[in-house]
Amino acid sequence: MTERLFLDDSSLREAQATVLRADASGIVLDRTPFYARSGGQPGDSGVLRWDGNEAVITETVKGESDAILHLASTAALPAPGTQVLAVLDWPRRHALMRMHTALHLLCSLLPGAAVTGGQIGADRSRLDFDLPDPPFKEALEDGFRSLIAAAHPITTEWVDEAVLDSNPGLVRTLSVQPPRGTGRLRLVRIGEAPPGKLVDLQPCGGTHVANTAEIGAIKVLKIENKGRQNRRIALALGA
């Protein structure tokens, strides 16, 4: 099993780790700041450094037995037991964090609309919603500006799975359900807990910024009809 350091600290840019396995299937570390591809968020890229050597990591994916596989494009691999420094491609990761949090804000701007699909990218992202009528682009952009300017804090907490059973409305996605079986779930909260200050709360295992101001400007690229009640909203990070 690989300890997922990003679950408790998404701002971590690098970390020391020990190699458990390294072969053609990937490099497995005992702990990592690299996010493994899942839930529509791409896996991280970066480098592993050790003893004057470097392995370029082009993708990170989930392996068996809760392992995370760091896929290297270089032939030289660190031997098991080697101490490495795992360093993220931070500009790319930070863009993905900004995008992911922006998509949670988008959910908050469309209360009650279930998410039917989505994809997160460093340059462009989108969510599909079960909506009878498309929202107005200007209204969404105004909503983004207000929420981002407010610098709402983003926090995470671990709760018992029973919380989800008693609050099924926390899950906004129809196509993907939060992983179950460990007995606990990670919630991502935007805003404060008191009534009127909570912006969004939903199960999520992805990486996020520390507050909404860190997102920066968001552009609504387009809103498309993808079926009788399916509306696709595409976003991009602004300058």
What would you call each of these model-derived segments?
Residues 1-239:
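Active-/binding-site microenvironments in catalytic and ligand-binding cores
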